[in-house]
């Protein structure tokens, strides 16, 4: 009934609407969710032997971690925690690059676990507390 391009356009509008109405705290949650989703897809593509799709999914996860989560850290206000997170994100990126080169599902799973732990901790933080000092 609907074309694939129509459905894709609707999904894009839905995502854009969610981003536009999200709080800064929710935007970070969305980045965690997006990175996790890309990692799950990468692992599934690896299991299916779809090397191209695996590479694209890992690239998306790396992009979200590097240009979203890491870039969003406030080194000045975050102090040691921000520095530690930045180093952990760098480690995750290296592991995902290795996973892509070596078709290493364990490396993907390792990053999934690390990211899941950080995301869970983020969800425990009050949205007010996470951005209160930014004002």
From Swiss-Prot:
The keyword Iron-sulfur does not apply. GO terms for biological process: bacterial-type flagellum assembly; bacterial-type flagellum-dependent cell motility. InterPro entries: FliS, FliS_sf. Keywords: Bacterial flagellum biogenesis, Chaperone, Cytoplasm. One of its GO terms (cellular component) is cytosol. It holds the Pfam family FliS. It is found in: Cytoplasm, Cytosol. Its main location: cytoplasm. Belongs to the FliS family. This is Flagellar secretion chaperone FliS. It comes from Salmonella typhimurium (strain LT2 / SGSC1412 / ATCC 700720). The lineage of its organism: Bacteria, Pseudomonadati, Pseudomonadota, Gammaproteobacteria, Enterobacterales.
